[in-house]
Amino acid sequence: MFGVAVLGVVIPASAAHAAPPGNLPQSAGGYESSFSPAYDYDGDGCYATPAIGPDGTLAAGLNPTGAVNGNCRDQSDLDNSQTYARSKCNSGWCAIVYASYFEKDQALPGISLGGHRHDWEHVISWVNQASNQVEYLSTTQHSSVVTYPRSQVRFDGSHPKVVYHKDGLSTHFFRLANGNDEPPENHYHNWRYPPLVDWNGWPSTSLRDRLMSADFGAATIKINDGRFGDLLSRAKPSGIPFDPWA
């Protein structure tokens, strides 16, 4: 058996890092499905994987060491992907938040400086119910959130294109796709639609509550009750009559 030697102790390869849990099947409403992001992932980062399995197993994550994309960008990870969603609609607008989990967020190869185990990144589709299309798109970027008008966003049909991207010497976030992103860099070289689970699509509320209350350290999931309204408030496009707290 091959293994990893650490201070003279041989750790079996199977125990060196835990594989992510299995994903949940697609379970989302028409609105959430229609305006979900079309995803790609730059080569210097991880693929989005499940944060929780059907049996309630939480993702263990990875130490931010080794290669920046080490142990988290295999085709098997891409095949076992997941997106979580939560929406709020009022005053003619719907904000649909899409949350993606990554096993680590590493800034520099070989060392953990500036990085952390676990990463949560979010994309918000702002849908005008009159036009029935995404008019604005927001992405979380480190500790901030940036909102873009439709004119700056590329689409795959009704789906805004975003790319999980390493920000220079810093860590990762979702950026808008651009003309250099064709074809996508993932193993299949196409835009990806991980199985989507919306707020009302969970197999049980207890499984949803387990994820929403889990501690991911420096990474925070922003579709739980404690952070959802604040995220919408910070991301809301100026001038639209949407109430993030309604």
Go through each PLM region and give its residues:
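Short beta-strand micro-motifs enriched in acidic
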Residues: 126-130
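Secretory targeting and sorting signals
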Residues: 1-18
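A domain-level signal for the mature, folded cores of soluble proteins
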Residues: 17-121, 135-246
